[in-house]
């Protein structure tokens, strides 16, 4: 009986992990940059503590020595990306998500297991995207949230950002604001799975930060929010009924 229970637990965990995912690749104006400017997470597990520094970019880089640090749950990324991706103000980047690290096929959902929820993208102006720790303010440039499919449909039939990712082989286009000031930015891609968000701490955040350099543009420098701090575990939309 004990071994049966253990096997059942392992099976349940495996099924749960299948639904997890990470943003991994970036396209710039239709050109595949692969993962060259992505701070790749070390696993496809989500962040669930909105008060943790992991809510920034899955982890943060210490300002003194740029060493990889993790939160108490062990959430981490591999640190600074290999390079920065250059994109013109007004250009289009395409974020790309898949369930397993290194995966790029379209044979499985980008994020499975009925992990329905919004997809949002933030940017943060920084001095150097390769060393920024994510403590600077972030402003939102994109969101793909919820839409009712029909008056007779059930909740699982509704439109969600994560469903759009699944429909498009994990890809989603995001326009960089045309008047944005030139310079280095962290581009923070986030999908929030709400299937377990009936109580505080149940929402699952799948986050990757990309290191980009914006060229051209103007002088726009939007006000933003801080992570952690922007979300509270009991906020409507983070906790759902």
Language model: regions and residue ranges:
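Surface-exposed loop/turn positions
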Residues: 91, 183-184
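Peripheral, solvent-exposed domain-edge segments
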Residues: 2-119, 125-171, 194-241
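Short acidic/polar micro-motifs centered on Gly/Asp/Asn
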Residues: 175-176, 193
């Amino acid at each position: 009986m004990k071994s049966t229970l253990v096997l059942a637990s392992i099976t349940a965990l495996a099924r749960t992990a299948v639904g997890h995912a990470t943003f991994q690749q970036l396209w710039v104006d239709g050109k595949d940059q692969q993962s060259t400017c992505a701070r790749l997470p070390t696993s496809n597990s989500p962040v669930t503590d909105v008060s943790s520094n992991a809510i920034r970019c899955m982890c943060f880089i210490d300002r003194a020595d740029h060493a990889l640090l993790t939160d108490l749950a062990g959430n981490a990324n591999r640190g600074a990306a290999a390079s920065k991706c250059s994109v013109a103000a007004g250009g289009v980047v395409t974020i790309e998500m898949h369930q397993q690290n290194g995966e790029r096929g379209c044979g499985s959902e980008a994020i499975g297991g009925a992990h329905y929820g919004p997809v949002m993208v933030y940017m943060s102006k920084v001095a150097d995207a390769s060393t920024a720790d994510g403590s600077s303010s972030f402003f939102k440039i994109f969101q793909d949230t919820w839409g009712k499919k029909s008056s007779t449909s059930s909740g699982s039939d509704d439109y969600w950002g994560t469903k759009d990712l699944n429909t498009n082989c994990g890809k989603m286009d995001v326009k960089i604001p045309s008047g944005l000031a030139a310079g280095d930015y962290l581009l923070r891609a986030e999908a929030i799975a709400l299937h377990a968000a009936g109580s505080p701490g149940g929402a699952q955040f799948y986050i990757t930060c990309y290191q980009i350099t914006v060229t051209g543009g103007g002088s726009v420098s939007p006000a933003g929010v801080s992570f952690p701090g922007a979300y509270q575990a009991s906020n409507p939309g983070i906790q759902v009924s």
